A protein has these predicted regions:
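Conserved active-site neighborhood of the chymotrypsin/trypsin-like protease fold
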Residues: 1-49, 70, 135-140
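Short, conserved catalytic or interaction motifs in soluble domains
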Residues: 4, 63, 87, 101
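Extracytoplasmic
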Residues: 4-8, 20-22, 34-35, 51-58, ...
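Flexible glycine-/small-residue-rich
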Residues: 12-15, 43, 60, 78, ...
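C-terminal cap/linker of serine protease catalytic domains
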Residues: 17-21, 45-46, 96-167
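Short peripheral tails and domain-boundary helices/loops at the edges of structured domains
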Residues: 59-72, 127-131
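Catalytic nucleophile loop of clan PA
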Residues: 79-100
């Protein structure tokens, strides 16, 4: 099934003996996403032949994008191209927060612009799946033994550096 307005499609995977071993990511219910949050986009550029991982942040939260009711999107400067359009926009917890879908190349009066990309919010995809007869239920949050939410940033060993005051020259 396909939604032309939302640019979403639902694909059926044929059952095989390996179906239970397919890796997957969870869809986020977006309880904690906000402007400035880091995100990742995964893709496969058409001409490059390599898988790519690009990083960026949530720049803006937009409701009813292009005047289409329910088409809520994130604006992100995460690099989106034809190779990762349709792929996941992932938060630091490894959950899908959006589906990469649109790239703005030109502004008013044909002025060239870069790094203005849009991803449909995962909650929009879930509402659409439910509306076409494929009910979806969110998974429970992943919790570690410390009772803290498990984060990709934590698992990667990335240590945040505190902001420091600038030293006058």
């Amino acid at each position: 099934q396909y939604s032309n307005e939302l640019d979403l499609a639902l694909l059926k995977i044929q059952k095989t003996h390996a179906i239970n071993r397919l890796p997957f990511l969870e869809l986020s219910n977006l309880r904690k996403i906000s402007i400035g949050d880091p995100v990742l986009a995964i893709g496969h550029p058409e001409q490059g032949g390599f898988w790519t991982l690009t990083t960026g942040t949530i720049s803006s939260l937009i409701e009813n994008f292009q005047s289409i009711p329910g088409k809520d999107v994130f604006q992100t400067e995460t690099s989106i191209n034809r190779g990762n359009s349709g792929g996941p926009l992932i938060d630091t917890y490894g959950d899908i927060v959006g589906i990469n879908s649109m790239i703005a190349r030109k502004g008013k009066n044909n002025v060239a612009i870069t790094d203005i990309n849009f991803s449909i919010k995962s909650t929009v995809a879930v509402k659409w799946m439910n509306s076409v007869g494929h009910p979806f239920h969110y998974a429970t949050p992943k919790v570690t033994y410390k009772n803290e939410t498990d984060s990709i940033v934590d698992n990667a060993g990335i240590v945040p550096v505190p902001k420091q005051d600038k030293i006058p020259i």
